[in-house]
Amino acid sequence: MEIRPAEISEILKKQIASFDTETDVAETGQVLSVGDGIARVFGLANVMAGEMVEFPNAGVQGMALNLENDNVGVVVFGDDKAIREGDTVTRTRRIVDVPVGKGLLGRVVDALGNPIDGKGPIEATERRLVETKAPGIIPRKSVHEPMQTGVKSIDALIPIGRGQRELVIGDRQTGKTAIIVDTFINQKPLNAQDDESKKLYCIYVAVGQKRSTVAQLVRTLEENGAMEYSIVIAATASEPAPMQFLAPYTGCAMGEYFRDNGMHALIVYDDLSKQAVAYRQMSLLLRRPPGREAYPGDVFYLHSRLLERAAKMSDEFGAGSLTALPVIETQAGDISAYIPTNVISITDGQIFLETELFFKGIRPAVNVGNSVSRVGSAAQIKAMKQVAGKIKLDLAQYREMAAFAQFASDLDASTQKLLARGARLTELLKQPQFKPLPVEEQVVSIFVGTRGYLDEVPVNRIGDFEAQLISEMKARSPEILDSIRNDREIKKETETKLVDFVKSFASSFA
């Protein structure tokens, strides 16, 4: 056999030139035990709290939550059935982060930001940590711009502003999600404009809900053209507790992208009671000490650190906003339970929905007496302030009188008038689902009710009166609605035109 030294030396030179002197160091650990979505891992001495770790054999990821002397408690994001005792666990050296940006609009993703709608990969250029600090005091500004829901009873009586946190609370099947969907649909005209400062991007976080419910919601948004400016994050009932715990923070990180870039976003957490239950499950399995109702001691902090991230930013910080509408489900109308009282104390007000009102046919079933907005009329346009102040007073007096009227046999004329007006205003605030009203139409309809033009109309015809009045006004005097929309107030000449129009319509209504 002939030995060719030149050829051999050439091969050796190439080998030496391409030799990689860098060593790839991976810090690994071993699974001690696994079950119920929690893995105990030995090793990983330098792992960070909240760091993503990988289980290469099982193809799933997890997050390090409990850092103890001799082991690390890891919550598993996915199915833990493929994880075995003794499996290798590797550090990723990054805290849990998710894709953010406009590429997510119109998409349905899971709690880690992975697409689950079958529309291909997400086009996102930026990633953000799911857990970040809320803005401080200096970067914030008081809430002053209205966030129109399109629901008369809310926009008039419990106004919500951009950057506010308003709790939607009520028993199951009282129309909580219906109000949310109406609010999303109502943003369509604003999002059709080119002005970024007026647009409101919508984010819906479904925690612990049925998959069929989420699919139906997405279909409704698509049918009404609202999905193109919305993001849906789904951690459904069949997913492990860590995913349900993480989903609200994921949604919040996506919303903060809009807030920090001078845009406006609305985020809905539906619902935080299920997130608290998922967190309780994780905490108990991690052997953290239980507190009241077996919730861990930091369940208040779980929600406060999430909701504090919703804010209206000052002009120096881009003037963006993130508005939060957390949802809480009560048991038998008990708003004084542990989780409801926690979230009520964190938020800037609550919209309380009642089963009794729902079954009476008052829908949306908002209990105006128990609902409040701590931002108040600062979040209303001037036109709404002009008409809504009176309706609050009238309804409060009506509720008080209605309670006494049950026991009184003969009532004086003024009381009868007050009861008749109250019944008509209650009827006026009813609204069909998926039919949000523009603010100028709401103003006209409340103006008509508070000025007494409905006093002679039979209660069962109030809905017809309102619908016909608005359609007649659009056809014959659209300038009245245009004036209210553009000026954001009812000017003297507009009011005169409005009164004349309503009077002539009322006389011809039959």
Curated annotation (Swiss-Prot):
Top class in the EC scheme: translocase
Protein's membrane topology: Peripheral membrane protein
Keywords: ATP synthesis, ATP-binding, Cell inner membrane, Cell membrane, CF(1), Hydrogen ion transport, Ion transport, Membrane, Nucleotide-binding, Translocase, Transport
Residues the record lists as binding ATP: G170, D171, R172, Q173, T174, G175, K176, T177
Enzyme Commission designation: 7.1.2.2
GO molecular function: ADP binding; ATP binding; proton-transporting ATP synthase activity, rotational mechanism
Taxonomic superkingdom: Bacteria
Gene Ontology CC: plasma membrane; proton-transporting ATP synthase complex
Catalytic reaction list: ATP + H2O + 4 H(+)(in) = ADP + phosphate + 5 H(+)(out)
Compartment annotation: Cell inner membrane
Primary location group: membrane
Marked site (Required for activity) residue numbers: S371
Complexes and interactors: F-type ATPases have 2 components, CF(1) - the catalytic core - and CF(0) - the membrane proton channel. CF(1) has five subunits: alpha(3), beta(3), gamma(1), delta(1), epsilon(1). CF(0) has three main subunits: a(1), b(2) and c(9-12). The alpha and beta chains form an alternating ring which encloses part of the gamma chain. CF(1) is attached to CF(0) by a central stalk formed by the gamma and epsilon chains, while a peripheral stalk is formed by the delta and b chains.
Function: Produces ATP from ADP in the presence of a proton gradient across the membrane. The alpha chain is a regulatory subunit.
Family to which this protein belongs: Belongs to the ATPase alpha/beta chains family.
PANTHER family: ATP SYNTHASE SUBUNIT ALPHA, MITOCHONDRIAL
Annotated protein name in UniProt: ATP synthase subunit alpha
Species in which this protein is naturally found: Acidiphilium cryptum (strain JF-5)
Primary gene name: atpA
